[in-house]
Amino acid sequence: MWNKQKQNIYAFIDSQNLNLGTSLNIKKKGMVVYKGWKLDMKKFYRYLSDKFRVTKAFLFIGYIPQNKKMYDSFRNFGYELVFKPTVIDHDGKAKGNIDAEIVLYASCLKLNEYDEAVFVSGDGDFYCLYEFLQKKGKLKNIIIPNRYSESSLLNKFWVYKIFLYREKSKLERK
């Protein structure tokens, strides 16, 4: 009898890129070319598990004490949260840039624990990480919230790209 070992597939999620990439309207020349929508994070976790066979999903997020209930909900859905302290920017908004944490986790801290990785971000800042993991045979997919906010640096990785807006009907919070 043939025995296939289960693969460990980890998801590394840029929460801010996911949130803004799905929820904000995008205009070009005064016309709305992308209508934002509310992503259901519980459905999204199931989507990652079912479609990509993700065994662990890391949600990288800036920590704001008032959002504790939301964080608890994310944990209950199955996400492992990785927090970054936030600072207040000049506009009075909390900012917690998590790019370095994603790179650290994916390329060092968790590298030997997973067979393949799925990334959720349209950010070109991860270009060198994707190249590194591609050479190691560990890059499975890059899920991009919408095609209008993805970095052109990701063009090289077209075979890995999945556009989340195409799954809106399945993943939208009603």
Task: For the regions a language model picked out, list residue spans one by one.
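Nuclease catalytic cores that cleave nucleic-acid phosphodiester bonds
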Residues: 65-174
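Domain-level signal for Mg2+-assisted phosphodiester chemistry and nucleotide/NA-binding surfaces
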Residues: 1-94, 98, 135, 139
